[in-house]
């Protein structure tokens, strides 16, 4: 009775360790290592379990470019593993291999005489595809584990892997639709360009085309006249400024010349002998 709480405690510890991992995804080897730490005794008695866990985990990383497991998928795998361990503890830990040898050597009708009261050691696996009355009996611990693990896949679908695959398909569909739209738009633009080129090259013109050309010609003439007027105004302004500037410089030069001439006369008159 105490084994179930113990298994649940181990699974909770595993979930806690996975949640504390710094990176968002883990490798299958890391998952196997964590399981091996907590379930070393189970792996020792059933060495084939690691291979089966790795095989099932590889299905969850097919769509991942780095072949890594999301934390949620890793927790789902651990949950399925713990469910198998809890529901079939006798099968996975203490089944006598001699019984299985006898089973393989016996016919189907002799199964009840071989196992007698120990027939409960073999789990009965129900298939969702069949009715509740149609069951099958597993012939070995490995088959029981694999079957139970496969059955658990119906209960813990790889949600993240599934949604990633679905969204990638949706994204590819949208990309193809967008590319198709772009090609359609490009072809339409090319057709319009060709039509415009052909209409320009046509010698016969409609009255509307003539009016349009006249309007464009008048607007271009107006723009040219406006540009010429603006340039002439700017040039006249520049010239007037230059004239004023030259006049000021000339006045300053004349004033300086007169001042120097007057001062030189005064100096010469002072230096004459009396």
UniProtKB/Swiss-Prot annotation:
One of the GO biological process terms: meiotic spindle organization
Membrane-protein topology: Single-pass membrane protein
Swiss-Prot/TrEMBL keywords: Membrane, Transmembrane, Transmembrane helix
Compartment annotation: Membrane
Top-rank taxon, per record: Eukaryota
Disruption phenotype: Leads to meiotic defects.
Name of the protein: Uncharacterized protein C1739.04c
Organism annotation: Schizosaccharomyces pombe (strain 972 / ATCC 24843)
């Amino acid at each position: 009775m105490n084994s179930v709480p113990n298994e649940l405690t181990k699974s909770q510890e595993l979930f806690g360790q996975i949640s504390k991992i710094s990176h968002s995804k883990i490798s299958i080897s890391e998952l196997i290592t964590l399981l091996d730490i907590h379930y070393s005794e189970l792996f020792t008695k059933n060495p084939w379990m690691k291979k089966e866990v790795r095989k099932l985990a590889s299905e969850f990383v097919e769509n991942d470019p780095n072949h890594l497991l999301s934390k949620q998928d890793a927790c789902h795998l651990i949950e399925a593993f713990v469910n198998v361990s809890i529901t079939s503890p006798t099968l996975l830990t203490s089944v006598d291999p001699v019984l299985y040898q006898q089973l393989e050597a016996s016919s189907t009708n002799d199964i009840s005489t071989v196992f007698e009261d120990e027939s409960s050691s073999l789990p009965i696996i129900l298939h969702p595809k069949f009715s509740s009355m149609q069951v099958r009996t597993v012939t070995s611990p490995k088959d029981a584990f694999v079957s139970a693990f496969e059955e658990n896949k119906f209960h813990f679908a790889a949600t993240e892997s599934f949604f990633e695959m679905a969204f990638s398909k949706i994204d590819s569909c949208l990309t193809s639709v967008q590319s198709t739209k772009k090609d359609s738009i490009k072809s339409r633009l090319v057709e319009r360009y060709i039509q415009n080129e052909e209409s320009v090259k046509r010698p016969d013109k409609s009255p509307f085309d003539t009016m349009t050309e006249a309007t464009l010609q008048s607007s271009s003439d107006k723009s040219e006249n406006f540009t010429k007027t603006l340039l002439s105004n700017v040039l006249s302004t520049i010239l007037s400024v230059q004239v004023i500037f030259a006049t000021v410089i000339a006045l300053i030069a004349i004033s300086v010349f007169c001042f120097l001439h007057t001062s030189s006369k005064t100096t010469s008159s002072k230096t004459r002998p009396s």
